[in-house]
Amino acid sequence: MISIKGTGRFLLDNYRIWQRRAFNRPIQLRKGYKVLAIETSCDDTCVSVLDRFSKSAAPNVLANLKDTLDSIDEGGIIPTKAHIHHQARIGPLTERALIESNAREGIDLICVTRGPGMPGSLSGGLDFAKGLAVAWNKPLIGVHHMLGHLLIPRMGTNGKVPQFPFVSLLVSGGHTTFVLSRAIDDHEILCDTIDIAVGDSLDKCGRELGFKGTMIAREMEKFINQDINDQDFALKLEMPSPLKNSASKRNMLSFSFSAFITALRTNLTKLGKTEIQELPEREIRSIAYQVQESVFDHIINKLKHVLKSQPEKFKNVREFVCSGGVSSNQRLRTKLETELGTLNSTSFFNFYYPPMDLCSDNSIMIGWAGIEIWESLRLVSDLDICPIRQWPLNDLLSVDGWRTDQL
C-alpha cells in the first residue's frame, strides 16, 4: 500500500518530469505560427499579435495596442505609477488584442521585453508573459528592448534589408548608442552616452521652454516646424560642444547631453528670459531651433569622429539604421543623410528608419526581434528569467536564461 506521503512524492516527481518535458518541447511549427508580443520597459503598455504565416514574407500585424501613462502633471515618469499602470492595463489590452486578432486559441510563441528598462515596468510585462507561457504551455523569448529598435527596419522586407553588417544609431529617451552589428547576436558598441540620453535632454530642454505633454521633444519639433522662418535670427545662444576632441580630450568616443540643459538655463538667465510664457513665439522658436540644432550637431560630430578614427571597421559597411523615438525627427534624418552620406571612404549609401508609428516604443518590434532570434539562433528563454535594468547589446547572449530550442 502506498502511503499518502509516498503518493505525494510520486505525484510531485511526475509533475516535475512533465514540467521539464513540457517546457523543453520545441516549437511545433505548422505552415506558419502566431506571436503574442508584449512591451513594458518604461511608461507604454504595448501588446500586439503577429502572424508569421510564411517565412518568405513579412509577418502580418493582426493587432497592435498601446496605452501610455499620463504623466503630464508630474512632469516626468514616476516608476511606481508606471508599475501600477502596467499592472492595470496589461490584462485588458491582451484580451482586446486576442479578440481583435481572433487568436485566443492560436498563439504559438510569446515574446516580451526583458530589458533594459525600469525594473518595475519590465516586471509587469515579463511576469504576465511568463504566466501565459505556463498556462498555455508555449515557449517564451525575453527580448532585448534595443535589439527590437535595431531590427524593426528589417521587418518590412522580411529581414532582407538592411543586411548585416550595418551600423545603427539608436536614439530615444533612455538610450543614445552607435552600434556596429555583424549578426543578430554580434553587436559592438562604438559610442554611448556618459550621462543622459538625447531624448531625455530634448524633453528637459523643451520643458524649460514651456512645452508640455508625454512626448515633449516631439511637441518642440512640431512647434519649430510650424513656421521655420518665423524666428528672431538676431537672438544667438551660446551652446556647448560636449567632450570636444581637443588636445586635452583625445579620442572621446562618447556622447554627452546633460550640458545642453544647463547651457539653456544659463542662456535664458543671461538674456533675462526667465518667464518663458511672456516671450514672443518667434523668440521661443529661435531658442528651440538652436537647442535642437546643437544637440544634433553633437551627435553628428561624434559619429564622424568614430567613423574617421576606425575606418577599418566600416570597410564593407554601407547601410545605416536610425531607430528609436528620436529617429522620427525629420531634421535629424536630414542631417544624418546630408553629413554622413559624403564622408569619402565611410560614406553610407542607404539609410533606413522605422515607419513613423514604430519609432517610439512598441510591441511589434519585440515580436519581430523574437522571430529573428528564434528563426536564426533557435533560442528561447527559461521561465525563471528576471528583468534586467542595464543590458548592453554586446552582452546579448551572455546573460542567464537562454537555451536552445531543438527542432
UniProtKB/Swiss-Prot annotation:
Quote the EC number. Answer: 2.3.1.234
Keyword Nuclease applies: no
Q: What is the effect of changing S172K?
A: Severely impairs t(6)A37 formation
Reported effect, D44A: Severely impairs t(6)A37 formation. No effect on dimer formation
Q: Which residues bind a divalent metal cation?
A: H145, H149, D361
Cystine pairs annotated here are none
How the protein is affected by changing I77E? Severely impairs t(6)A37 formation. No effect on dimer formation
Assembly information from the UniProt record? Homodimer.
Which family does this protein fall into?
Belongs to the KAE1 / TsaD family.
Q: Which NCBIfam families does this UniProt record tie to the protein?
A: gcp_kae1
- From the Swiss-Prot or TrEMBL record, give the protein name: tRNA N6-adenosine threonylcarbamoyltransferase, mitochondrial
Give the originating organism.
Saccharomyces cerevisiae (strain ATCC 204508 / S288c) (Baker's yeast)
